[in-house]
Amino acid sequence: MNPLWQQYIQILNQVVKPALGCTEPIAAAYASAVARTLLGIVPEAISVQVSDNLYKNSMGVYVPGTGKIGLAIAAAAGAIAGNAEAGLEVLAAITPEQVAQAQDLIDAGKVKVERTETEEFIYCCVTLKAGEQEALVKICGGHTLIAEKRLNGEPVFTADNAQSAATGSICDGIDISIKSIYQFAQEVPFDQIKFILKASELNGKLSDEGMAKPYGLEVGRTMKSGIAAGIIGEDLLNKIVMLTAAASDARMGGANLPAMSNLGSGNQGIAATIPVVLTAQCYNVTEEKLARALIMSHLGAIYIKSHYPPLSAFCGNTVTSAAASMAMVYIAGGSFEQSCFAIQNVISDSSGMVCDGAKASCAMKVSTSSSAAVRSFLMALNSQNVSGQGIIATDVEKTIKNIGKMILNGMSSTDITIIDIMST
């Protein structure tokens, strides 16, 4: 196989993976679970220090299996019931009795959560104490990327390179572009990419869950009621928005089902998957073509997001939906040029959407960007595109660089302001 394609598959396997619950509080649960394996006994006290961005994305979202919100319950649950071997599915087997144990620790004032100053966007340091014993685990640069382990002050493990880059480093040193992703998705042997179909299965189950039960703001179920009442129609646009939002409703509402995430985000994994799957159903394409489209969507999203920090004031659903729109054009039989038009159109439409933390209303943002993806792919098929206007360049690669520049140079103060507003 082409060595470059092997690198692309490695990237996908590394950052497109199942995640149970919003990944920021789950990072704390995972760190606690790893620390518990070091400590060897149930902790009497837990201390959690996190970056501002991780704090922001943990303030308003339910931790799966607990029915509760926030970093304190995530860390306590991880220490009591977490499976350190399960990664982002660390809390998959938690029981109501264990949730009660975790809550007892919190009620006794034994769980302390603090923000800490750090240059890292993803940072979580958990310390567990029991008597004279103490275990520390530090996560840095990625939701399950362990930088350091200590037992009673003595180093047990230190990563060779604990510091993450200021921007997503997943694509650093790799020859990758929208054109190469498009070619890879079209030409790579099907058996090498079949694994991506798991995204359709997992995120489809979340969508079904969100439609069946009243999670969060019930964005998906509200649209279903509107269809039943004859207020809106059940066309492709509304079906995509409804079912994509429903999956996010369930995820943000603490459903005990994993999402297939994209670069650490379950919602963005949903946005990269469900619109593509529903478009494939509409056009009645083969399973192989669906897999190729999902590869295009997920890897395209990863590539665009590698141009800016993993957590920021920018809502990543925008560029994820841009990649999904590119894949939707491919499914519909459009050209590479038209796929680029779709990316340009979505970014032009939705690039002003900010991230003000993970919470129930994320389902609305997912629905907004997914709606833009549908409009944009239809416009692209008609060869209508935004070009040379605002931050949208005449070339898609330049537009992607412009997004990175806007976020890195223009939105750092926005992020600080958002966190300040949320913390007062």
UniProtKB/Swiss-Prot annotation:
Superkingdom of the organism of origin: Bacteria
GO BP terms, alphabetized: L-cysteine catabolic process to pyruvate
Family: Belongs to the UPF0597 family.
GO molecular function: L-cysteine desulfhydrase activity
Protein name from the UniProt record: UPF0597 protein Sputcn32_1209
PANTHER family: UPF0597 PROTEIN YHAM
InterPro entries, per database record: Ser_deHydtase-like_asu, UPF0597
Pfam families with a match to the protein in the record: SDH_alpha
